[in-house]
Amino acid sequence: MSISQLSQMFMTCLSLTMIILILPITFSFITKPSNKWPFQVKNAVKLSFFVSLIPSITCLNLNLQSFTIYYQWFSISSTKINISLQFDQYSMIFMTIALYVTWSILEFAIYYMHTDILINRFFKYLLTFLIAMMILVTANNMFQLFIGWEGVGIMSFLLIGWWYGRADANMAALQAVIYNRVGDIGLMMTMSWLLINTNSWDIQQLFGLTKNMDTTLPATGLLLAATGKSAQFGLHPWLPAAMEGPTPVSALLHSSTMVVAGIFLLIRLHPLIENNNNILTAALCLGAITTLFTATCALTQNDIKKIVGFSTSSQLGLMMVAIGLNQPQLAFLHICTHAFFKAMLFLCSGSIIHSLNDEQDIRKMGGINKTLPLTSSCLTIGSLALMGTPFLAGFFSKDAIIEAINTSHLNAWALVLTLIATSFTAVYSLRIIYFVLMNHPRTLPLSPVNENNPLIANPIKRLAWGSIIAGLILCQYILPNKTQTLTMTPMLKLTALIVSLLGLLTALELASMANKQIKINPTKFTHNFSNMLGFYPHIMHRLMSKLPLMLGQISATQMSDQLWMEKLGPKGIAHTQLLVTQKITHVHKGLIKTYLSIMMLSIIIITIIIMIT
C-alpha cells in the first residue's frame, strides 16, 4: 500500500470517526428530544470505535511511526495557525481505547440515569467531553491542544456539578475549575514562551527549534499544567471531591479523559523535557509523593467511590514517576491498561450503589458476592488488576514502571515511596473486596438488588475482558523493540509482587482488627491523618481562606473603625480638647468671686499695658 493510499485511508477513517461523533450533537439542535437519543449516542460511539479500529490496526501492523495531516486555518502577521492532526501510536491507540471505554460507560449510563429528566442533555455533555479529549489527543499544534484542554475542563465542571441542587456537587465543580485554572496558567505560560521564542506552535517544529535553547521555563509550565489536570500533590483535592458527580461521569473522567490529559500532555511534548534533569527530577519526586499520599488517604476511606477515586490519583502519580524516569512509553502503557479496570471499578461501584438504594458506605455493605455475582466477579478482577496481579492488564504496565525505577540510578527515596504506595494499593483494593463482597450482608433488607439488566452486564463484561487481555496485547506494540536487559536479580524482578503480597497480609490483619476493635471511631493520629486526607483540605480551604478574612475583619474594625473613626476622628479630636476644656470650664461655673477676680485681673493687665506704652 502506497503512502498516498495510506494517507487517504487514514483521513477517511478518522474524519468519519469524528463526523459520527459530532452528528448526534448536531441533530440534537434540529430534531425534537427523543427517548431513543441516548441509545443513538451509544450506537454512534460504538460505530466510531469499529471505524477507528481500521487505521489503528493498520498503524500497529505496519509499525508506522507518525502520520500528520495539515489544513490551513488562519495566520496572524508572520505566524500561521494550521489545523494539524497527528496520528501516531499514542493517538491511534488512545482514541480506540477511549471510544471502547466510552461505549461501555454510555451503555451503563442509560440504565444508571434512566430516571433523570435531563438524560438527553447528560449524554450530550458526555459526548462533548469525549470529542474534546479526541481534539487534545490528535492535536499537532499547541492552539488545537489548548482548545481540547479547555474543552475537557469546562465539560468536567458541567458534569461534576450535574446535580446542581446539592451544595457538595456545586463545591466540587468549582474546586475542579479553580484547581485546573492554576494548571492552565502553566500551559498558557508555555505557549507564550514558545510563540515569543520560536514563532511557532507546531509541535513537530518546536522539537527542532528548541533543541539548543534553555527550555526550563516552558518545561516548568508543562509540569504545572500536568499537576493541575492530572491531580498531582498540591493540586489534588478536586479529584476526590469530583466523586459528587454521577458514577458514569466519574468512570469517564477517571479512565480515559480529563485526568489523563495532563500526563498525555507530558508524553506528547516529552522531547521538550527529556534533557532537562531538573524537571525530570521534579516530576519523579512529585509523582512519588502523589502516589504515596493518595494511597495513604485511600486506606481509611469508607465511601466506595472515594476509595476508587483516590486509587486513580495514586496511579496518576505512578504515571508521573514514569515520566520522571524518562520513560513516556511506560506512562502511556499504564494510561491504556488503567482505563479498562478503572472504568470497570466505577461501573461495578455504580451497580452496587443502585442495588443498595444509593448506599456508598462500604461498612453498610457485605455479602454482595451472593446477590450480585457478576458485579462481584468483575470488581474482584478490577481490584486484582489495580494491584498488579500477574497476567492481568495492570501487571504489564505497573510492573514495568517499578522495574524501570528499580534498575535506574535515580532518587532512592522515590523508589521507596513508590514501593510503599504499591503495597498500600493492595491494602485498599483488598479492603474493598473484604467489606463489600465477603461476610454477611449489612444492608437494609428491602434493597432492589438486580443485575439481570443487559445495560449493566454487557458494559462490565466488556471492560472485564479488557482488564484481562489488554495489557498483554498492548505491551507488544507500545514497549520499544530492543534487546531485553537480562541482568536483573530475582529479588529486583519480583519486587512489585513482593510488596503487593505484603499489602495483602497487611489488609488481612487490618480486616481482622476492624472486626475486633473496641472503639467505634478510631482516635489514632495516623487514622485521622489518612481519613481526613492529611488535613490538606482543612488547611488550604479553611485556614488559607480564614486568614485573609480575619485580616480583613481586623483591618475593617481595628484600622478603620477604631483608628480613623475613633482615635483620629471625632473621638480623637474631642479627647485632645478635653484637657483644655477642663481647665477653662472653671471660668463658666457662675461664681461671683470668679467673675470679680477676672475683672480685677483684666483691669491690672490693661493698666500695666497703658503705663508701659
Swiss-Prot record:
Keywords: Electron transport, Membrane, Mitochondrion, Mitochondrion inner membrane, NAD, Respiratory chain, Translocase, Transmembrane, Transmembrane helix, Transport, Ubiquinone
A Pfam short name: Proton_antipo_N
Bilayer disposition of the protein: Multi-pass membrane protein
Signal peptide annotation: none
EC nos: 7.1.1.2
GO CC annotation: mitochondrial inner membrane
Biological-process GO terms, alphabetical: ATP synthesis coupled electron transport; electron transport coupled proton transport
Superkingdom of origin organism: Eukaryota
Catalytic EC class: translocase
GO molecular function: NADH dehydrogenase (ubiquinone) activity
Subcellular location: Mitochondrion inner membrane
Reaction(s) this enzyme catalyzes, per UniProt: a ubiquinone + NADH + 5 H(+)(in) = a ubiquinol + NAD(+) + 4 H(+)(out)
Transmembrane segments: 10-30, 49-69, 92-112, 117-137, 145-165, 176-196, 247-267, 279-299, 307-327, 330-350, 376-396, 410-430, 455-475, 494-514, 592-612
InterPro entries per UniProt: NADH_DH_su5_C, NADHpl_OxRdtase_5_subgr, ND/Mrp_TM, NU5C-like, Proton_antipo_N
Principal location: mitochondrion
Family to which this protein belongs: Belongs to the complex I subunit 5 family.
Function according to Swiss-Prot or TrEMBL: Core subunit of the mitochondrial membrane respiratory chain NADH dehydrogenase (Complex I) that is believed to belong to the minimal assembly required for catalysis. Complex I functions in the transfer of electrons from NADH to the respiratory chain. The immediate electron acceptor for the enzyme is believed to be ubiquinone.
Protein name: NADH-ubiquinone oxidoreductase chain 5
The species this protein was found in: Polypterus ornatipinnis (Ornate bichir)
